[in-house]
């Protein structure tokens, strides 16, 4: 039986071989395929933390926990030593202020100066805002995550168990429109929680590995809150691409053999979806190949 990570490696190889060369928003350029699907079985405790390169899984889980707070400012992320969202506010600050500040100096200023953080660390109404405080036309805020968990508990056969972040009225105010847009859930007759994540845009080398981990961690938390066990995680990509400055790294990764996937488990049952902390997650048996460095396209 093929290693489940081989699906991802095959997608890298297909993109390298058949990807359509395109000029993109960032100016870097991409090789792009449209429409991809991967399926991972989480029922045995294994999770899709790639082994053909080191994935910093704690960073991905911390990001997911930040989404669940409804946060839209990078300061709490920086306080957790998570820097994956700094590029966009940094670019905005440089553009508007004219100051050629380093990323490290910018992040330090965000950490030390609350007023500066409030002005320049803000990302706009990104994921967490839409997940937890979607503003309706009547002024009422909708908590999509709470509604999802309540439906899982009370009507698990529903086909309406999803949440998304593509708020048309607010997309233009976001530092980056949502890439991982829609999360849909499905409960089997024997109590397994399946999840489907749709991404409209996929940075295959850097973004997708983090999205796999975040979605799996979220599935574990939601399953626990609803009294279910994790099942399949289905990942669907729209514009699935490799940036042209990531091609050598992708070739290197496809030449590596996958190792046994690690297991992720929750160390306690949190009182609610809002009460999980990074210390609640344990990953066991993770033995990856070395990390592969690559630049983020902004």
Swiss-Prot record:
Record-linked PROSITE patterns: THYMIDYLATE_SYNTHASE (PS00091)
GO molecular function, one term: thymidylate synthase activity
Binding positions ((6R)-5,10-methylene-5,6,7,8-tetrahydrofolate): 203, 297
UniProt-listed GO biological process terms: dTMP biosynthetic process; dTTP biosynthetic process; methylation
Enzyme class, UniProt record, top EC level: transferase
Catalytic reactions on record: dUMP + (6R)-5,10-methylene-5,6,7,8-tetrahydrofolate = 7,8-dihydrofolate + dTMP
Keywords associated with the record: Cytoplasm, Methyltransferase, Nucleotide biosynthesis, Transferase
Pfam families: Thymidylat_synt (PF00303)
Record CDD domains: TS_Pyrimidine_HMase (cd00351)
UniProt pathway: Pyrimidine metabolism; dTTP biosynthesis
This protein's record includes keyword Transferase: yes
Main subcellular location of this protein, as a coarse class: cytoplasm
Keyword Transferase applies: yes
Location in the cell: Cytoplasm
Active site: 179 (nucleophile)
GO CC term, one of those recorded: cytosol
Residues that hold dUMP according to the record: 25, 159-160, 200-203, 211, 241-243
Enzyme Commission code(s) on record: 2.1.1.45
HAMAP family: Thymidy_synth_bact
Assembly notes: Homodimer.
Family: Belongs to the thymidylate synthase family. Bacterial-type ThyA subfamily.
Function in brief: Catalyzes the reductive methylation of 2'-deoxyuridine-5'-monophosphate (dUMP) to 2'-deoxythymidine-5'-monophosphate (dTMP) while utilizing 5,10-methylenetetrahydrofolate (mTHF) as the methyl donor and reductant in the reaction, yielding dihydrofolate (DHF) as a by-product. This enzymatic reaction provides an intracellular de novo source of dTMP, an essential precursor for DNA biosynthesis.
NCBIfam families in the cross-refs: PRK01827.1-3, thym_sym
Protein name: Thymidylate synthase
Gene for this chain: thyA
